[in-house]
Amino acid sequence: MQRPVALALELHRHGASFVVVGSAAAALRGEPARPADLDVVVHPDDAGDFVSAVRALGGDLGLPQLRRCRDVHVDTAWGPLDVFLAAYPVDVPVRVGERALRVAT
C-alpha cells in the first residue's frame, strides 16, 4: 500500500472528513500514479475534526492556521500532507480494505 493511501486511512480512522485529490486520488481510481504525498480538500465545517485527526498523527496543524491560510503543508508521522480548505469537489467512494475513502473524480 502506498504511504499516502495509508495516511488517508489513518485520518479516516481518526474521524476526519475529507476528499482525496491529486495523484493519490488518481492512484486510488486505478490510474498509473505514484503519489509522493497526500492532497486533500476539507470543507470548512469539517475543519475542526480534521485538525484533531492530523494532530493525533503527529502533525503540527491548528484550526486558526488552516482557516487563515486555506491551504497548508503538514508533515505527519505517516508522511507529508497538503490540505486545502474549500467546498468538496465531486467525489466517489473507493473501498480500501474495510474503509471507503472519498476520492475526487
Language-model segment annotations:
Residues 1-105:
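Compositionally biased terminal segments of proteins
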